[in-house]
UniProtKB/Swiss-Prot annotation:
It comes from Legionella pneumophila (strain Lens). It comes from the Bacteria. The keyword Electron transport does not apply. This is Elongation factor 4. PANTHER family: TRANSLATION FACTOR GUF1 HOMOLOG, CHLOROPLASTIC, TRANSLATION FACTOR GUF1-RELATED. It catalyses: GTP + H2O = GDP + phosphate + H(+). GO terms for molecular function: GTP binding; GTPase activity; guanosine tetraphosphate binding; ribosome binding; translation elongation factor activity. The gene is lepA. Required for accurate and efficient protein synthesis under certain stress conditions. May act as a fidelity factor of the translation reaction, by catalyzing a one-codon backward translocation of tRNAs on improperly translocated ribosomes. Back-translocation proceeds from a post-translocation (POST) complex to a pre-translocation (PRE) complex, thus giving elongation factor G a second chance to translocate the tRNAs correctly. Binds to ribosomes in a GTP-dependent manner. SMART domains: EFG_C (SM00838). It is an enzyme of class 3 (hydrolase). The keyword Protein biosynthesis applies.
Amino acid sequence: MLFARRLEQLKDLNRIRNFSIIAHIDHGKSTLADRFIQICGGLTEREMSSQVLDSMDIERERGITIKAQCVSLNYTATDGKTYLLNFIDTPGHVDFSYEVSRSLAACEGAILVVDAAQGVEAQTLAVCYTAIDQSLTVLPVLNKIDLPQAEPERVISEIEDIIGLDAQDAIRVSAKSGLGVNDVLEALVANIPPPKGDVHAPLQALIIDSWFDSYLGVVSLVRIVNGSIRKGDKMRVMSTGRAYEVDQVGIFTPKRTKLDALYAGEVGYVVAGIKEIQGAPVGDTLTLDRNPADKVLPGFQRVKPQVYAGLFPVSSDDFEAFREALAKLSLNDASLFYEPESSEALGFGFRCGFLGMLHMEIIQERLEREYNLDLISTAPTVVYQIVTQKGETLLIDNPSHLPPTPQIKEMYEPIVRANILVPQDYLGPIITLCVERRGVQVSMTYSGRHVSVVYDIPMSEVVSDFFDRLKSVSRGYASLDYNFQRFQIADLVKMDILINSERVDALAVIVHRDSAHSRGKLIAEKMQQLIPRQMFDVAIQAAIGSHIIARQTVKALRKNVTAKCYGGDVTRKRKLLEKQKAGKKRMKQVGHVEIPQEAFMAVFQTDKKK
């Protein structure tokens, strides 16, 4: 059998180690995970591929981890004992921080991977603090030690100064070549505490993740805190009280491997033929029907979406398939929020909430690839707080739902606290960018070559292309982490886009009054380039209320109707031109302008001059 000494380990919880790998994007988490699998024999050389845990095509193409993946491995340490290692490879991007906090809840320790050339970055900091808050043992590891530009001594002092961890004994590795990886495994066994739990107590299992399988139904990734669960048991989902018979339990090695039972301290999967998509929500507790636990395990704090956008199927026939696809995806991604929405321009669709712009791109790409849907997305917006003249407080995530201007007393916009870590050489351009985006400096701290700059910036300025601009002005060296701080009063207006004098509800945006003119002009210019020419002039206007602030015209395609007139009277030519003019006028009244997807995205991409 795969785990010959498994039962012996499980009777002795001291032989189990549960840990996560945390790091900034591109610091080598997934490569280090590959080496662990190779050393512990999880896969043969033939089955190995790079980024073996990044199972989605999008993850491999973009070189990022989106979904946390769990693997159980056997490792024989130098003390001669065989340990069961359950580890979770987590995402590094700020948009997927919720995925990281869920993974950490199932662990007793974490490996903090830091690039020996690039050093500590803002997201490393954020994730590391989450791990420390959850009382995990954090092991610092310096990766890419074989690079000529690696500076381990500088990075060790950065870890100590910026994060506050003792990093003198940080293990130096090269995940690519495998150098020092065995030392990491030994340090894990020696330093990370074993799980606490009682195999004989009533079952308490925390659902870390769930996804929908077309054949098996809902598959739940669980951490068994107390008790045990085996095939044939009747389990109960504690939030709903519904009971299901367990069809299959097992672990990932990283291949899905069936087992007879899962015991306290283990991380594995449970299949119970749950067909309804919300049957086993993430963060819920599973127990046994015959001997239930008294208490529900503390779950996860629900995360609030930061960015909202409308998603609409190009063909209205796909609406039901789209609804089903969103339901399946929201099971796998608990941070995705959606509700039905209708638009005059785009028909029926859904208003979706995301954690950030990358999250939104990934969700749209997954829906299109995995469920073969053709979608149009509207410009993303954040949540605004409105106080009406009657004293009511409203939260608005869609500009077309904004009350008429006379009814609005005050408008508040969300402010985020952005923590930017940047080398001193690029500090000037970063400050300029933050001021451009209406940022207010909170603090600035120098540590070694890096500066930690903290700004309060309106969220609407951050969620557009702030991250890309930050990377471009700092040549990729700056890193960003941000979280919601408060709502702040602001002079905001709703800007409508009119195509041939018709308001297109899906193109409306809420902007700051000071930047409305420049923003309206930019959007109109961009739309002029993107909307294809018609047989009649197309007027593109940006308006605040009834006041037009910008206009561009897409000139008509023109047929030379006088070409057939050779010589002859000028009145003949004039008659043909008048006839053409009348035809174009009539066409303009009934003509329909197709707006391409790029035009919807132009509304938010033209945020400021590039």
